[in-house]
Amino acid sequence: ANTLNVGESGLAARLFTPIAALGGEAMRIEGEGTLRHRPMAMMVEPLRTLGVEVRDGGGRLPIEVHGPIKGGRVVVDGSISSQFITGLLIALPCAKSDTTIEVRDAVSTPYIDMTLETLERFGVEAMHNEGDYSEFYIEGNQEFTAIDYTIESDWSAAAFIMVAAAIAGEVTVRNISTLSHQADTSVCRALERAGAAIIIEQGATSVSHRPLEAFTFDATHSPDLFPALVA
């Protein structure tokens, strides 16, 4: 089998495994470090249901997939991460058959919105009822259209700098938009609750220190903010 080593990236593992299953050859997905101990079992049965041969290491990497992925009806556990759902939404438009994905307990739903918006930009459609992430319908045999695309700045990375400024300084982060679908834009709301000063302008957000206080924040849909906010 060919090998794809994703390093320590959980996103790459969950995103590229269903994409790798589009081909007709076996592909072994490997990882390094702590990624080898992170849960991947949520991918195994859905991929098998979609016609992929899967050999897994007890719900952990490495995982070997042998496609092609065929489509059909599949149930996916969305309670751990939306990353695998994103991988399916990217891969399944290229399957030979139509697919219905039933998602149970979806988290990080803003990232699903980002995926759907990006697919649309590339000429691919995955249908669902707005605000409802429990079911998606994807026609097979779609084709991606090549376009020029500008990748947004990363709010997950910016959050650490903004939190540092709230604790002991001042910073202006440019070329980021609070209108983004990225879930981590909510770091601004969290810092405001903590008492930091936030100024939002077009294309830039400024954060400066003020006396901070305890606050409550639900990170269900923005888990990447948790390490920064606990500071």
Predicted segment positions?
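Short, structured segments at the rim of ligand-binding sites
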Residues: 1-231
